[in-house]
Each structure stands twice: as structure tokens, then as C-alpha cells.
Amino acid sequence: MLNLKADHPIGIFDSGVGGLTIAKAVIDNLPNESMIYFGDTKHLPYGDKSIQAIQGYVREIVDFLLEREVKLILIACHSASAAAYEMLQNYIGNRALLVNVIDPVIKFLSENYAGKRVGLIGTKLTIQSGIYHKKISELECQIDLCALATPLLVPIIEEGFFEH
């Protein structure tokens, strides 16, 4: 059973600063919550790393967040979600809630694009993991997913290109 306290912070992490957009959405929707954001710019980008390396990085980040008694950990990185979500579920156990960024995207697609063709760009790891295809096929929502690995995506996001 989870032993969470309402006044404990929410922990959010990403391989860099791109997850700050998700952190902002959390702040906008939950303005009374405190938050700890961890941007792992030391190992940026995750998308070209091995699954084992990413799992090691995120285990250290999760330890850092758990030491600060977060009640919820939000993985704001698609590559980390693809590589480590299941491992982190087991690792964290009942010490905190765990949320990834892939499941909400799948839910949105299934509710709004069933029977349609959808394009997906992502890191090499995210695309090669097949996680989006797997989750879409489990829902049987007939989405024709066209996925393309885009190596320059992370540098573009990290440089703030979309803000200009």
C-alpha cells in the first residue's frame, strides 16, 4: 500500500530540459503542488544510448527523487519511458506512484484518431522499441502508425527551436 503524503512533492525527470514543457503543464493544472525537476543533461540524449545504460541513469535519478520523498514520479522522456518504465515499476514498488509519457499519448490517439493514419517521430530508441505499435495494437483501435526515428529531434528541442 502506498504511503503518500499530500504535502510531498511530485518528481519529474527527463534526459534534458525538454520535459520542462510537461512540468509547466503540471504546474498549470496543479498550482498548489510542489515539484522537483531533474534534467539529466549529463547523459543527454537518451535516444542513442543502450537500454541498460538508460536503466542505470534513471535508477539513480529515481533514488535521488525518492530520497526527497516524492509522492509521484513522472517520466517526462519518451526514451526513458520506453526503456525503463516496466523496470522502474518493479524498482519503485509502493514507494511512489509512477507515470510515463507514452500511455497518455496512446490514450489520446485511441480516442481521437481511431481508424486513421498517424505519423510519429521520436528518438532511435523510442521508435526501435516498438512500444507505440505494441500499445496501439493492444487497444485494437485500427490506427495506422507510421513511425520515423529522427536523430536531430532532441537537439532541436533542447535548443528551444520550437519556441521561436
PLM region spans:
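Non-catalytic structural scaffold of enzyme domains
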Residues: 1-164
